[in-house]
């Protein structure tokens, strides 16, 4: 999926995450994470975001993630929403997304 514009999903409320995604002209995935639990879960959060991006077919984007203690399902949902908004996609393939959790 091609990232065409800047998009945001989520909030800075407790137990949530704000994901900002933008195009970066073919420089791969650049991920910046700001998390209050980075020492304990930073590697896991990064891996989850990158896996979700790979599942969506995103090969090039800059992602800024500000985590406020979000659960995995929230991180994945915010990433999916931001990618679809940034790509201009209006219809989700729920069967494909659901298959990731099999």
Curated annotation (Swiss-Prot):
The keyword Nucleotidyltransferase does not apply. The modification O-(phosphoribosyl dephospho-coenzyme A)serine is found at residue 14. It is found in: Cytoplasm. Pfam families: ACP (PF06857). GO terms for cellular component: cytoplasm. The keyword Phosphoprotein applies. InterPro entries: CitD, Mal_deCO2ase/Cit_lyase_ACP. Keywords: Cytoplasm, Phosphoprotein. Its main location: cytoplasm. Covalent carrier of the coenzyme of citrate lyase. Oligomer with a subunit composition of (alpha,beta,gamma)6. Belongs to the CitD family. This is Citrate lyase acyl carrier protein.
